[in-house]
Amino acid sequence: MLYSKENKESYLEPVFGSSAEDRDIPKYTLGKEPLEPRIAYRLVKDELLDEGSARQNLATFCQTYMEDEATKLMSETLEKNAIDKSEYPRTAELENRCVNIIADLWHAPKDQKFMGTSTIGSSEACMLGGMAMKFAWRKRAEKLGLDIYAKKPNLVISSGYQVCWEKFCVYWDIDMRVVPMDKEHMQLNTDQVLDYVDEYTIGVVGILGITYTGRYDDIYALNEKLEEYNSKTDYKVYIHVDAASGGFFTPFVEPDIIWDFRLKNVISINTSGHKYGLVYPGIGWVLWKDESYLPEELIFKVSYLGGEMPTMQINFSRSASHIIGQYYNFLRYGFEGYRTIHQKTSDVAQYLAHAVEQTGYFDIFNDGSHLPIVCYKLKDDANVNWTLYDLADRLQMRGWQVPAYPLPKSLENIIIQRYVCRADLGFNMAEEFIQDFQASIQELNNAHILFHDTQQSGVHGFTH
């Protein structure tokens, strides 16, 4: 055979016989010479070998599977910049359709003009919702003659809050008034919420799916309390619903729960498309019931690449591929498709909860009957020499990532464990997990020496 190329290494030798494998490639400085694509690919892939399997990660809410067609479509649109509305008008139209679909799903009133935008996730969406509440409160307060500088404005939320709300309050100088959860109220205690509200309250956050346990705040009852409060004062207080987890789940599986724009005092909602919207990270959405709840000064008219567009985002340039992936899912599944997928996921969660309870060692906090989250603690009389941290370690040895952590402040002495069931966790995979779960417990029961901590320090809050 004749060869026309002098450097045969690039096409004859395997990756592991190449010169790149003969030396230690710089890792914290740029290498002197470029590498062939196949070698760079292999080196990076090898770096990731010892990471856990995303499919076995029961700690995350984030989507870990999409159909091949969706993945292909997203990979073909990675180069599109979502901010370039004039350059990619059809992409902008798909985003507009997504906002309209979500507004319809959340029962936005037909006689009002809703507003909405995509974000890189629910954390950014919460920031935008919080900013709108602060600016709207300031305008209302100034109009009523309140000295807005006399003290800091405040935000009311349960202690089951997601960490992005703490960030929001720090970044925008807001006093976060936390309503503590207790054993009788493992979500927002609506009977106490008005004790935390005053004329400096920019809003109350209701959580549709507390990250710790998967439980819902009673948004309907919260609306009733604020309606009572608002009827007696000119200093109106409204609700932002953090539906990062529940916003794309509850409408399909529990449509009778009234939590959305049907409630008078719910004025804005956020959700994560990369959770039960079934898109890879990261994509989020935030909507306002009416344009009057989104102060004009937060909307910027940006001249960019030949066009002018309104924008209300903290971030600027980002790929449009996740917006396109979200629209693909809406088109592909429709209402019935989402309902079928989420109902199956809920069934799997309840199956897991039953299997956990059958061991006799655990008290169940959440059995997957709302969000498909299984959450439990060791019984006080379990009479075992191991902790949930030990169990988490044993499961990790089998590839499963299952978190154990303390509940929020006022309940931090309670250690719980949690599974997040996603669309790609079917009954067969769930059965494999239960077998590993039972085997791990058996190993711990038979272990002669255990090394464990009774508590894990400094771990509170989660990210979207």
Curated annotation (Swiss-Prot):
<dbReference type="GO" id="GO:0030170">
    <property type="term" value="F:pyridoxal phosphate binding"/>
</dbReference>
<dbReference type="GO" id="GO:0006538">
    <property type="term" value="P:glutamate catabolic process"/>
</dbReference>
<dbReference type="InterPro" id="IPR002129">
    <property type="entry name" value="PyrdxlP-dep_de-COase"/>
</dbReference>
<feature type="modified residue" description="N6-(pyridoxal phosphate)lysine">
    <location>
        <position position="275"/>
    </location>
</feature>
<comment type="function">
    <text>Converts internalized glutamate to GABA and increases the internal pH. Involved in glutamate-dependent acid resistance in gastric fluid.</text>
</comment>
<comment type="similarity">
    <text>Belongs to the group II decarboxylase family.</text>
</comment>
<keyword id="KW-0456">Lyase</keyword>
<keyword id="KW-0663">Pyridoxal phosphate</keyword>
<dbReference type="GO" id="GO:0004058">
    <property type="term" value="F:aromatic-L-amino-acid decarboxylase activity"/>
</dbReference>
<dbReference type="InterPro" id="IPR015424">
    <property type="entry name" value="PyrdxlP-dep_Trfase"/>
</dbReference>
<dbReference type="GO" id="GO:0004351">
    <property type="term" value="F:glutamate decarboxylase activity"/>
</dbReference>
<dbReference type="Pfam" id="PF00282">
    <property type="entry name" value="Pyridoxal_deC"/>
</dbReference>
<dbReference type="InterPro" id="IPR015421">
    <property type="entry name" value="PyrdxlP-dep_Trfase_major"/>
</dbReference>
<protein>
    <recommendedName>
        <fullName>Glutamate decarboxylase beta</fullName>
        <ecNumber>4.1.1.15</ecNumber>
    </recommendedName>
</protein>
<dbReference type="InterPro" id="IPR010107">
    <property type="entry name" value="Glutamate_decarboxylase"/>
</dbReference>
<keyword id="KW-0210">Decarboxylase</keyword>
<dbReference type="GO" id="GO:0005829">
    <property type="term" value="C:cytosol"/>
</dbReference>
